[in-house]
């Protein structure tokens, strides 16, 4: 009975993780500019991948595998948004413009940064 409950929990976590990954993929295709696409990939993709990794660790029924999966999940959650932020900042400094639908640009452009 306990194994069946674990199997259902793993299946539920995998479905939720797959939905987040699907939302990240849709965001990559549908969003208008580099910055919003990176936001979709880093946020929803991180949650989706992390949930799938967590489900795989739980499915193994081995404490060592589960701890490794959990460590990988924590590492991924800590590093993916930071790397996306740094890539977006580098793209902004390289001159990639935001979409016209974007509301505000809080980073100064190269010319403005040099004047200060």
From Swiss-Prot:
Domain of life (superkingdom): Bacteria
GO molecular function: sodium:proton antiporter activity
Any Pfam family matching the protein: PhaG_MnhG_YufB
InterPro entries named among the record's database cross-references: PhaG_MnhG_YufB (IPR005133)
Family, per entry: Belongs to the UPF0091 family.
The protein, known as: UPF0091 protein R00998
The species this protein was found in: Rhizobium meliloti (strain 1021)
């Amino acid at each position: 009975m306990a194994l069946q409950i674990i199997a259902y929990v793993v299946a539920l976590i995998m479905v939720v993780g797959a939905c987040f990954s699907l939302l990240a993929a849709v965001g990559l295709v549908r969003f208008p500019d580099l910055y919003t696409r990176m936001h979709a990939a880093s946020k929803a993709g991180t949650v989706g991948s992390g949930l799938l990794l967590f489900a795989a660790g739980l499915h193994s029924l081995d404490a060592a595998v589960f701890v490794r999966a959990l460590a990988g999940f924590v590492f991924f959650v800590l590093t993916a948004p930071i790397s996306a932020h740094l890539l977006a900042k580098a793209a902004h400094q390289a001159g990639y413009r935001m979409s016209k639908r974007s509301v505000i640009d809080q980073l100064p452009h190269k010319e403005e940064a040099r004047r200060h």
